[in-house]
From Swiss-Prot:
Pathway: Cofactor biosynthesis; adenosylcobalamin biosynthesis; adenosylcobalamin from cob(II)yrinate a,c-diamide: step 7/7. Keywords: Cell inner membrane, Cell membrane, Cobalamin biosynthesis, Magnesium, Membrane, Transferase, Transmembrane, Transmembrane helix. It is found in: Cell inner membrane. The chain crosses the membrane at residues 40-60, 67-87, 121-141, 150-170, 191-211, 213-233, 243-263. One of its GO terms (cellular component) is plasma membrane. This is Adenosylcobinamide-GDP ribazoletransferase. It is a multi-pass membrane protein. The keyword Magnesium applies.
């Protein structure tokens, strides 16, 4: 695959998943159009790594300025939220409200479409942010700032692959939602996405942490994926864009916890 093609697809993925001011490419003249998921699926973990790198730079910079690890972790997570425009956090809140507050499929989907945040969504957001900050702070304490930064980069990459694989594993829960408009990836596109994410995990975590940590990094997103597949499949009979976003949030938390539990060398 040509480097120019990879660069074009990476930019398209970053435009969709972040607020970075990137120009439209040749294949996507409309910067606000939804890109073809089958085309950019393999580039989504790469986009996640770029987004994670922004948080990692903020983390290392804050720690280099002698800020406390807790504050540095808060700033890093804040940078990630600002970079993505709380894209996945919004999906987490909507999913928590819908799955937690609805009595049947129709009501759950209606609640998820409501832009207002309810009790379940608010609690999910608070807990998710706390868990990300706490896990990052603990990683800084146990592994050092540079290894914690590496883990953050890989977590953001691998967790986005989990969201893509959810779209592949389940049918759209409704015909007119974001999950349907973004498209359902083909098996080959999903496999390419998973392989790129796995490659990033191995290439970065094995030298930085060791084989056991890399293995945990491979398993963690799958644990989050299967948990969200089971929950979403049972309660709404499929997937939505919100559930894919929630899967990314759950996956990044489980990933960071996995690295903490299996710290390697």
């Amino acid at each position: 695959m040509q480097l120019d093609r990879i660069a074009q697809d990476l930019v398209a993925a970053l435009r969709f998943y972040s607020r970075l001011p990137l120009p439209a490419g040749r294949d996507d003249p409309d910067a606000f159009a939804v890109p073809s998921l089958n085309r950019i699926a393999y580039a989504i973990p790469l986009a996640g790594a770029v987004i994670g790198l922004i948080g990692a730079v903020v983390l290392v910079g804050a720690l280099a300025l002698k800020l406390p690890a807790f504050l540095a972790s808060v700033l890093a997570v804040t940078a990630l939220v600002l970079t993505t425009g709380a894209f996945h956090e919004d999906g987490l809140a909507d999913t928590a409200d819908g799955l937690g507050g609805g009595r049947d499929k129709a009501q759950r989907l209606a609640i998820m479409r409501d832009s207002r945040i309810g009790t379940y969504g608010g609690c999910a957001l608070i807990l998710a942010l706390l868990l990300r900050v706490a896990a990052l702070e603990a990683l800084v304490a146990s592994a050092g700032m540079f290894r914690a930064a590496l883990a953050l980069v890989v977590a953001e990459a691998a967790s986005r692959a989990a969201g893509v694989l959810l779209l592949l594993a389940l049918p759209p829960a409704r015909a007119d939602g974001a999950g349907a408009s973004f498209g359902r990836p083909s098996e080959s596109a999903g496999l390419a996405c998973a392989l790129v994410a796995a490659l990033l995990v191995v290439v970065i975590l094995v030298p930085g942490f060791g084989i056991s940590t890399a293995f945990a990094g491979l398993i963690a997103p799958l644990v989050a994926l299967f948990a969200m597949m089971r929950l979403s499949g049972r309660l709404i009979g499929g997937q939505t864009g919100d559930v894919a976003g929630a899967t990314q949030q759950v996956a990044v938390i489980v990933f960071l916890l996995g690295v903490l539990i299996f710290p390697g060398r």
